[in-house]
Protein backbone atom coordinates (compact mmCIF):
# COMPACT_ATOMS: atom_id res chain seq x y z
CA UNK A 1 0.00 0.00 0.00
CA UNK A 2 1.31 3.39 -0.96
CA UNK A 3 1.64 5.96 1.80
CA UNK A 4 0.66 9.53 1.18
CA UNK A 5 3.43 12.06 1.41
CA UNK A 6 3.06 14.05 4.56
CA UNK A 7 2.63 17.76 4.01
CA UNK A 8 4.74 20.12 6.05
CA UNK A 9 2.59 22.02 8.49
CA UNK A 10 2.87 25.74 8.85
CA UNK A 11 3.63 26.83 12.37
CA UNK A 12 1.21 29.63 13.18
CA UNK A 13 1.65 31.35 16.49
CA UNK A 14 -1.86 32.46 17.39
CA UNK A 15 -0.57 35.42 19.39
CA UNK A 16 1.12 36.77 16.25
CA UNK A 17 -1.89 36.22 13.99
CA UNK A 18 -3.29 39.41 12.50
CA UNK A 19 -6.71 40.53 13.65
CA UNK A 20 -9.04 41.12 10.69
CA UNK A 21 -11.41 43.99 10.16
CA UNK A 22 -14.82 42.54 9.35
CA UNK A 23 -17.52 45.21 9.63
CA UNK A 24 -18.47 47.69 6.94
CA UNK A 25 -18.34 50.47 9.54
CA UNK A 26 -14.65 49.76 10.22
CA UNK A 27 -13.82 49.79 6.49
CA UNK A 28 -15.68 53.09 6.02
CA UNK A 29 -13.99 54.66 9.05
CA UNK A 30 -10.54 53.77 7.70
CA UNK A 31 -11.45 55.05 4.23
CA UNK A 32 -12.69 58.33 5.74
CA UNK A 33 -9.33 59.28 7.25
CA UNK A 34 -7.72 59.66 3.82
CA UNK A 35 -4.30 58.40 4.97
CA UNK A 36 -3.62 56.31 1.88
CA UNK A 37 -0.80 55.24 -0.38
CA UNK A 38 -1.21 53.75 -3.85
CA UNK A 39 1.32 51.39 -5.39
CA UNK A 40 1.15 49.30 -8.57
CA UNK A 41 0.16 46.17 -6.64
CA UNK A 42 -2.10 47.58 -3.95
CA UNK A 43 -3.62 50.56 -2.19
CA UNK A 44 -3.09 50.91 1.56
CA UNK A 45 -5.39 52.92 3.83
CA UNK A 46 -4.67 53.50 7.53
CA UNK A 47 -6.44 54.95 10.55
CA UNK A 48 -5.91 54.90 14.30
CA UNK A 49 -8.27 52.62 16.17
CA UNK A 50 -11.11 54.40 17.95
CA UNK A 51 -10.95 54.48 21.73
CA UNK A 52 -9.56 51.55 23.64
CA UNK A 53 -9.92 48.63 21.26
CA UNK A 54 -6.93 46.61 22.39
CA UNK A 55 -4.01 48.39 20.67
CA UNK A 56 -3.13 45.43 18.43
CA UNK A 57 -3.05 46.34 14.79
CA UNK A 58 -5.96 45.14 12.65
CA UNK A 59 -6.12 44.64 8.92
CA UNK A 60 -8.84 44.26 6.29
CA UNK A 61 -8.67 43.13 2.67
CA UNK A 62 -10.86 44.04 -0.25
CA UNK A 63 -10.93 43.40 -3.99
CA UNK A 64 -13.56 44.91 -6.26
CA UNK A 65 -14.80 43.45 -9.53
CA UNK A 66 -12.28 45.61 -11.35
CA UNK A 67 -9.63 43.15 -10.17
CA UNK A 68 -11.24 40.37 -12.20
CA UNK A 69 -13.55 37.42 -11.77
CA UNK A 70 -14.09 35.66 -8.43
CA UNK A 71 -11.02 33.47 -8.88
CA UNK A 72 -8.77 36.48 -9.52
CA UNK A 73 -10.27 38.43 -6.59
CA UNK A 74 -9.77 35.54 -4.18
CA UNK A 75 -6.21 34.97 -5.38
CA UNK A 76 -5.44 38.68 -4.98
CA UNK A 77 -6.82 38.66 -1.42
CA UNK A 78 -4.82 35.54 -0.55
CA UNK A 79 -1.65 37.21 -1.79
CA UNK A 80 -2.46 40.39 0.17
CA UNK A 81 -3.02 38.30 3.32
CA UNK A 82 0.35 36.58 2.84
CA UNK A 83 2.14 39.88 2.26
CA UNK A 84 0.47 41.47 5.29
CA UNK A 85 1.37 38.49 7.48
CA UNK A 86 5.04 38.87 6.60
CA UNK A 87 5.32 42.68 6.68
CA UNK A 88 2.79 44.14 9.14
CA UNK A 89 3.89 42.43 12.38
CA UNK A 90 7.36 43.97 12.00
CA UNK A 91 6.59 47.29 10.31
CA UNK A 92 2.97 48.09 11.19
CA UNK A 93 2.11 50.36 14.11
CA UNK A 94 0.18 49.07 17.09
CA UNK A 95 -3.23 50.65 17.56
CA UNK A 96 -3.71 51.17 13.82
CA UNK A 97 -6.25 49.74 11.40
CA UNK A 98 -5.05 49.01 7.87
CA UNK A 99 -7.08 48.21 4.76
CA UNK A 100 -5.32 46.64 1.78
CA UNK A 101 -7.14 47.11 -1.53
CA UNK A 102 -6.23 44.83 -4.42
CA UNK A 103 -5.57 46.33 -7.82
CA UNK A 104 -5.98 44.79 -11.27
CA UNK A 105 -2.39 43.45 -11.33
CA UNK A 106 -2.22 42.16 -7.76
CA UNK A 107 -2.82 38.51 -8.62
CA UNK A 108 -0.08 38.45 -11.30
CA UNK A 109 2.47 40.74 -9.65
CA UNK A 110 5.66 38.99 -8.47
CA UNK A 111 5.48 38.38 -4.73
CA UNK A 112 8.75 40.23 -3.99
CA UNK A 113 7.39 43.32 -5.74
CA UNK A 114 4.12 43.02 -3.82
CA UNK A 115 6.10 42.99 -0.56
CA UNK A 116 8.07 46.05 -1.70
CA UNK A 117 4.80 47.80 -2.59
CA UNK A 118 3.41 47.15 0.88
CA UNK A 119 6.60 48.27 2.64
CA UNK A 120 6.73 51.48 0.60
CA UNK A 121 3.06 52.19 1.21
CA UNK A 122 3.54 51.67 4.97
CA UNK A 123 6.42 54.16 4.99
CA UNK A 124 4.35 56.71 3.07
CA UNK A 125 1.27 56.31 5.29
CA UNK A 126 3.32 56.60 8.48
CA UNK A 127 4.83 59.87 7.18
CA UNK A 128 1.43 61.27 6.21
CA UNK A 129 -0.49 60.36 9.32
CA UNK A 130 -4.27 60.27 9.31
CA UNK A 131 -6.23 63.40 8.42
CA UNK A 132 -9.81 63.40 9.61
CA UNK A 133 -12.25 64.70 7.08
Regions found by a protein language model. Give the residues of each.
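Positively charged, solvent-exposed patches that mediate nucleic-acid binding
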Residues: 1-133
Amino acid sequence: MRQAAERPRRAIDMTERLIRLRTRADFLRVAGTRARAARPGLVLQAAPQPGETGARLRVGYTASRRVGNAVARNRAKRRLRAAAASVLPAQGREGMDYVLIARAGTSERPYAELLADLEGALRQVSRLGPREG
